[in-house]
Amino acid sequence: GISNLHLRELHIEINMKIGLCGTMSVGKTTLVKALQELPEFKDYNFATERSKYLNDLGIPLNTDSTLKGQTVFLAERCAELMNDNIITDRTIFDVIAFTQNAKSIARQDKEIFEDYAKEFLREYDYIFYISPDGLPIEDNGVRETDEYYRDIIDFSITTLIRKYSHMVDNITTIKGSTEERIEQILNVVKS
């Protein structure tokens, strides 16, 4: 009821940096837009995927991405983290995963990039990972719709989460409908 919602609102810390991570087409942007409607997050900044905008600027995406392009994506994530209270639909984990799978980036550059980028993982208070299991790929005209590539990015993200879990205070897997995911997020951040 209303009293329950009111109690929940009181227990959410004022300033939190919350990131959603996961491969393409798992509902990250949809979820951020839904969280934006909640009174609990009325004082938050929200950042959603800008790949279409960046692609329009001439920055190559997905397997065609370059070191320069991935550096722009990393800078965007860092800019988001300059906000005290932010909810974003991409994290540093995502940026590293896409960098690892870019064809034109040399292996040693990928390693240097990862080593540098991972330092910013400490900034997140919460990261929520969304699995692609059982979810179809939607074509938004920009994202990669190749199932194999989506699985590779997911594998890279989950591997990075295991590798660097000690650097993030709270990493939680969420699943289900948008409503169920919201409930899971609220349960974690209010505890």
Language model regions located:
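Conserved substrate/cofactor phosphate-moiety recognition/catalytic segment
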Residues: 36-78
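A glycine- and Lys/Arg-enriched "phosphate-lid" helix/loop adjacent to the NTP-binding pocket
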Residues: 103-176
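Conserved lysine of the Walker
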Residues: 28
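Short hydrophobic targeting helices and cationic amphipathic motifs
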Residues: 5-7
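Glycine-rich phosphate-binding loop used to anchor ATP phosphates in small-molecule kinases
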Residues: 70-121
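Hydrophobic anchor at the beta1->P-loop junction of P-loop NTPases
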Residues: 20
